[in-house]
């Protein structure tokens, strides 16, 4: 009798699953770019309204994402043009998967700068696309000539550009991204998962540029547990994407919470501003430590290069702080770690440990 594994695709058996860290109780979780606080914390009236709306949500009925009113709320909150259509996803990860499926014709190629979000390459492999990774420059800026040459040579059906980039935090220039869009015949996805921390967006161009999809999520602005992502683009493309999305891919509680949050976006925006201020404070303090290379970030995390990534990672973990060790993921990430911007107390704890490891006594004089 054949093993049941013999019926499973060989290429999938050869893959590794995405690793989610098991975080013990009491740890500061600074590895996944989550908000350090509940987005409604400190706003008792809003919390009460949220609880009442959750209690009234029709959880006995299948959700209708397209008729939920969430697209209209997103359009209003983020100035998405009327000419753009919006597709909702169970997190932007789901949309990355289905956009890949949408373009995965035999022989089609996907292009992305590297290092970047690992799920681009993963989905290319899953759906049989040729993957073209173009290395960034050593300072994590975009190697635009190399990208444009790869576009010319491989004619990718799908290109992903993370803006700002993950895991580096570095933001490519708007002119560079526009050049890639203009040079591409295929679809270009500008992945703005961290766009709220950048201050710039391609959302106003959604629906106006035929081959542009702008991808966003509510996860990084305090709602990672909701799993709500959205893609905005021209109706011709988004309409095709809608055909292959699962019919009930959102849930009633997430839809209810997201609509409420967008009606009170001023509170969410204030939380974002606080994190941006903490990011700049951390960047300034890390920059004072001469043995570190701290990369400028426009996201809610900071990437650093240290003399020994294993030593810092293990020391932080011994002190109940979990960050993301990037060392080994890509040659350009040698001895790099990614630190989510947490609460001021969490950030101070990280800074104190780094100072103990890497500051010389003369650094304090």
Curated annotation (Swiss-Prot):
<dbReference type="InterPro" id="IPR015424">
    <property type="entry name" value="PyrdxlP-dep_Trfase"/>
</dbReference>
<comment type="subunit">
    <text>Homodimer.</text>
</comment>
<keyword id="KW-0808">Transferase</keyword>
<keyword id="KW-0028">Amino-acid biosynthesis</keyword>
<keyword id="KW-0368">Histidine biosynthesis</keyword>
<protein>
    <recommendedName>
        <fullName>Histidinol-phosphate aminotransferase</fullName>
        <ecNumber>2.6.1.9</ecNumber>
    </recommendedName>
</protein>
<dbReference type="GO" id="GO:0004400">
    <property type="term" value="F:histidinol-phosphate transaminase activity"/>
</dbReference>
<dbReference type="InterPro" id="IPR004839">
    <property type="entry name" value="Aminotransferase_I/II_large"/>
</dbReference>
<comment type="similarity">
    <text>Belongs to the class-II pyridoxal-phosphate-dependent aminotransferase family. Histidinol-phosphate aminotransferase subfamily.</text>
</comment>
<keyword id="KW-0032">Aminotransferase</keyword>
<dbReference type="InterPro" id="IPR015422">
    <property type="entry name" value="PyrdxlP-dep_Trfase_small"/>
</dbReference>
<dbReference type="GO" id="GO:0030170">
    <property type="term" value="F:pyridoxal phosphate binding"/>
</dbReference>
<comment type="pathway">
    <text>Amino-acid biosynthesis; L-histidine biosynthesis; L-histidine from 5-phospho-alpha-D-ribose 1-diphosphate: step 7/9.</text>
</comment>
<keyword id="KW-0663">Pyridoxal phosphate</keyword>
<dbReference type="Pfam" id="PF00155">
    <property type="entry name" value="Aminotran_1_2"/>
</dbReference>
<dbReference type="InterPro" id="IPR015421">
    <property type="entry name" value="PyrdxlP-dep_Trfase_major"/>
</dbReference>
<dbReference type="InterPro" id="IPR005861">
    <property type="entry name" value="HisP_aminotrans"/>
</dbReference>
<dbReference type="GO" id="GO:0000105">
    <property type="term" value="P:L-histidine biosynthetic process"/>
</dbReference>
<feature type="modified residue" description="N6-(pyridoxal phosphate)lysine">
    <location>
        <position position="220"/>
    </location>
</feature>
